[in-house]
Amino acid sequence: MKKIKYFLQFLGIISLFIIFKVIGLTLSRIFSGYLLRLLGPLFRSKKIIHSNLLTAFPDSSEYERKKIIKNMWFNYGQILAEYMFIKDFRKNSNYSKKIIIENFDELKNVNLDSKPVIFISGHFNNFELMAMQIEKLGVDLAAVYRPLNNFFLNNIMEKIRQKHICKKQVKKGVSGTKKLLEHFKNGTSIALMIDQRVSQGIRCNFFNREALTTTIPAQFVKKYQAKIIPVHIERSRNNLFKLKFQKAINFSDDEDIKSITLKLNNILENMIIKNPDQWIWSHNRWK
């Protein structure tokens, strides 16, 4: 039964991709944005989204939460449409010029040739463009990804990611962590999303509630004195993207795994608070 469900989802997405290719990026964003805004509230994740927003913003009004959800689904739809044009964002200057780099000096201030760094972020807006653009800036990069449950779609997505987003893709999990270590020792920087629940993590405050959080960045800091560079991407109303680098974080020797992880969670919180409708709220973060 699950295979049939996944195959039907696969056919639906492929059909949409064909439509996107025919009508072009601008119309695809509008069509897909409104489509997801219409269908999104029907998905099973509806309760999780509402619960997550109440956890993060307990003093928010129902109107404010509904507005965030509505904008999130529209944004989700735009991201879906943009997958069909990832190759263009990679190779076509008319697309890539829509991605503006802010605080590029923060990268220049870190000598990546002598020692790799850990880029940390979350699922903001079209998060796939972050790893793609960092690699295009000349950074030797490995990006961690979580395979899709739908194996029909996952096969396609893995090929898209490896060919057009970031050549060095590392699957999330124990084997992936070993691969990350291998890459890092060979001078490759790491791009890691820290906003999802992980079974191997530690319980750490995130919006004043404990959530299982990855300790991979903290472990690299303690063992290899790795520098952490927070980065996130924002979409403006005219569909320009701003890729924003923050200053590299240096941690003191007396900071432990928990305190480092908490500090990174706090940074992530601030990113979300600034643009709550550009973060994907459908993940069961506090399970």
Task: Place the predicted regions along the sequence by residue.
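Membrane-anchoring hydrophobic helices of lipid-metabolizing enzymes
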Residues: 1-118, 156
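Conserved beta-strand termini and adjacent loop/short-helix elements that scaffold enzyme active sites
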Residues: 102-104, 144-146, 171-173, 246-248, ...
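Non-catalytic C-terminal accessory region of glycerolipid acyltransferases
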Residues: 66-70, 109-112, 136, 174-287
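Hydrophobic alpha-helical segments typical of transmembrane helices
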Residues: 15, 27, 49-52, 130, ...
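Catalytic core of membrane glycerolipid acyltransferases/transacylases, capturing the structured
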Residues: 113-173, 200-204, 210
